[in-house]
Amino acid sequence: MKIAVLGASGLLGSAVCRSVIHRGYSLLAYSNRETISFSDQYHSKQLPFSDDNQLTREFFDQWPDAVVNCAAISSPDTVDQSPELAHLVNVEGASRLASISAHIGARFIHISTDMVFDGSTSPYRSTDMPNPLGEYGRQKLESEKRVLSVTDENLAVLRVTLLNGNSPLGIRSQHEKILRALMSGKKLTLFDDEIRQPCSVENLSDVIVELIERPNLNGLFHWAGNEEISRYELGIQILKRFGINPENIIRGSIKNLENHGQRPQHLSFILEPLASKVRTVPLSIEEQLKELQIPKDLYSWYRKFADSPNCYIPRF
């Protein structure tokens, strides 16, 4: 089976590429900017998602059996600053990919977000009514509707939560951002009243490949880890995992954030019915933390900065 992954240079997209290779499938990896090497055989190819003709030509030439859309402008701040540009990727690009996939008979997996909800009645089922507070959530909800309107067969939309993992460039995930802030001499303020249900990208990518393998699983689903935690406590747990003094993180409140009304305070998921239909089991936060690695370019700094650097064994 030949599987195309869009957004291959991102945190989730790169994990999906690794999972595809691990399962023994043929990989077509595409990224908008950076080129990433996954093995001697597989490398990502630059493909502008806004170029309809080039996108169509590439997929008609390659004719993949499945397409996974991890491509998105996912920073709410970036979306707010450039909503029209974000719309081209988050909505128009997703709709275009769904249509092309349907035309060539490829199974289509589209990744969405917990930010389609307002956070007032967590935990959410996949059948609950969305009510996004910000532009990013509104765009992802629109992308869901566009994608699901293409066909009700051979297609799945998967909403996901806050992601833990190791990105190719070492700059995308929660722990990477925290470590880079500390390296620059900053102390971070994280909110103890902003609750999320983090998910491992490695675990999530296994679920995505299972969805590809299960053409009977169509429609809208939720996936996450199996525990809720505040952003503040997650930051503390990340520092403890790497033997760094947790006092480097300051406790704050989301209520003190400017425009906090546009940011959901409590987002968590009910994972059924998907959890009972796939072999992959959602991970605890402790299990997710064990997967995290220090980016290579930060390792020398980390050895000097951490109180107990020997608690971490590098895998590069």
Question: Can you name each region flagged by the protein language model?
Answer:
Residues L190-I195, F221-E228, K277:
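Glycine-rich Rossmann NAD(P)(H)-binding loop
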Residues V207, R214-H260, Q265-H266, Y299-F316:
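Mid/C-terminal beta-alpha module of Rossmann-like enzyme folds, strongest
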Residues L88, E92-R96, V116-L158, L162-G165:
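Catalytic helix-loop patch of NAD(P)-dependent Rossmann-fold dehydrogenases
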Residues L6, Y30, V67-A71, F108-T113, ...:
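SDR active-site strand-loop-helix element
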Residues A29-F38, P48-F49, A71-A72:
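N-terminal Rossmann-fold cofactor-binding loop
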